[in-house]
Amino acid sequence: MLIWWRGKFRRADEISLDFSLFEKSLQGAVYETLRTYSRAPFAAYKHYTRLKRSADFFNLPLSLSFDEFTKVLKAGADEFKQEVRIKVYLFPDSGEVLFVFSPLNIPDLETGVEVKISNVRRIPDLSTPPALKITGRTDIVLARREIVDCYDVILLGLNGQVCEGSFSNVFLVKEGKLITPSLDSGILDGITRENVIKLAKSLEIPVEERVVWVWELFEADEMFLTHTSAGVVPVRRLNEHSFFEEEPGPVTATLMENFEPFVLNLEENWVGI
């Protein structure tokens, strides 16, 4: 693990926070999670824009320009000989930024994962906007405590609509059509989600962004999740419902196969890198 704090790269045991900063961080720190592809920071500008958007909810200053942000990302990633996961935290009041770099170790997910429907409902948009990425969101914290013997849990909205996983976006396939909850369902505008939608359209796979009801998941032909670290993650089982035993369905498999080449060649993912 490598940490960037107050202009320097440091080891974890070299970091100390004064108590007032620690206390404020307990109120919630704005954050983003990035990764590298071919050891280059993926979608840095989009992540920076989202970080600033979250900061704006609190009228927080962001102490780094985009150029400074990318310099830290690239310098930190260069210290590793493999792909890297990067967590970026923006502390309340001060606007100071902390980067945490760690090796990206993704297990083999091609055989699919099991997910479950969470008992926790998504906080309504008027209470906490889904576009706000902040540590300590109570719905996410409580939902993640339910992740036992499964990969992720799916949060529903107050009306029973499908929202998202505790760290992922949700997709289903029905009769060859790709369907995903629309942004007004109460979800984060995931960057990997956006790339998968663009990939599907480039492959002439029909895409629907709309309100999705929980029963539709159980009637789907295929289901998968998307998130920064792993890209496209096929769902083998939802609660007691099985989607496949050996291999993901054809649409999921096609998107998995084409995802990395697509994101590597989409120029908007590499602005400033």
From Swiss-Prot:
<dbReference type="Pfam" id="PF01063">
    <property type="entry name" value="Aminotran_4"/>
</dbReference>
<protein>
    <recommendedName>
        <fullName>Probable branched-chain-amino-acid aminotransferase</fullName>
        <ecNumber>2.6.1.42</ecNumber>
    </recommendedName>
</protein>
<dbReference type="GO" id="GO:0009098">
    <property type="term" value="P:L-leucine biosynthetic process"/>
</dbReference>
<dbReference type="GO" id="GO:0019752">
    <property type="term" value="P:carboxylic acid metabolic process"/>
</dbReference>
<keyword id="KW-0808">Transferase</keyword>
<keyword id="KW-0100">Branched-chain amino acid biosynthesis</keyword>
<keyword id="KW-0032">Aminotransferase</keyword>
<comment type="similarity">
    <text>Belongs to the class-IV pyridoxal-phosphate-dependent aminotransferase family.</text>
</comment>
<dbReference type="InterPro" id="IPR050571">
    <property type="entry name" value="Class-IV_PLP-Dep_Aminotrnsfr"/>
</dbReference>
<comment type="pathway">
    <text>Amino-acid biosynthesis; L-isoleucine biosynthesis; L-isoleucine from 2-oxobutanoate: step 4/4.</text>
</comment>
<dbReference type="GO" id="GO:0052655">
    <property type="term" value="F:L-valine-2-oxoglutarate transaminase activity"/>
</dbReference>
<keyword id="KW-0663">Pyridoxal phosphate</keyword>
<dbReference type="GO" id="GO:0009097">
    <property type="term" value="P:isoleucine biosynthetic process"/>
</dbReference>
<dbReference type="InterPro" id="IPR036038">
    <property type="entry name" value="Aminotransferase-like"/>
</dbReference>
<dbReference type="GO" id="GO:0052654">
    <property type="term" value="F:L-leucine-2-oxoglutarate transaminase activity"/>
</dbReference>
<dbReference type="InterPro" id="IPR043132">
    <property type="entry name" value="BCAT-like_C"/>
</dbReference>
<dbReference type="GO" id="GO:0009099">
    <property type="term" value="P:L-valine biosynthetic process"/>
</dbReference>
<dbReference type="GO" id="GO:0052656">
    <property type="term" value="F:L-isoleucine-2-oxoglutarate transaminase activity"/>
</dbReference>
<feature type="modified residue" description="N6-(pyridoxal phosphate)lysine">
    <location>
        <position position="133"/>
    </location>
</feature>
<dbReference type="InterPro" id="IPR018300">
    <property type="entry name" value="Aminotrans_IV_CS"/>
</dbReference>
<dbReference type="InterPro" id="IPR043131">
    <property type="entry name" value="BCAT-like_N"/>
</dbReference>
<dbReference type="InterPro" id="IPR001544">
    <property type="entry name" value="Aminotrans_IV"/>
</dbReference>
<keyword id="KW-0028">Amino-acid biosynthesis</keyword>
<comment type="function">
    <text>Acts on leucine, isoleucine and valine.</text>
</comment>
<comment type="pathway">
    <text>Amino-acid biosynthesis; L-leucine biosynthesis; L-leucine from 3-methyl-2-oxobutanoate: step 4/4.</text>
</comment>
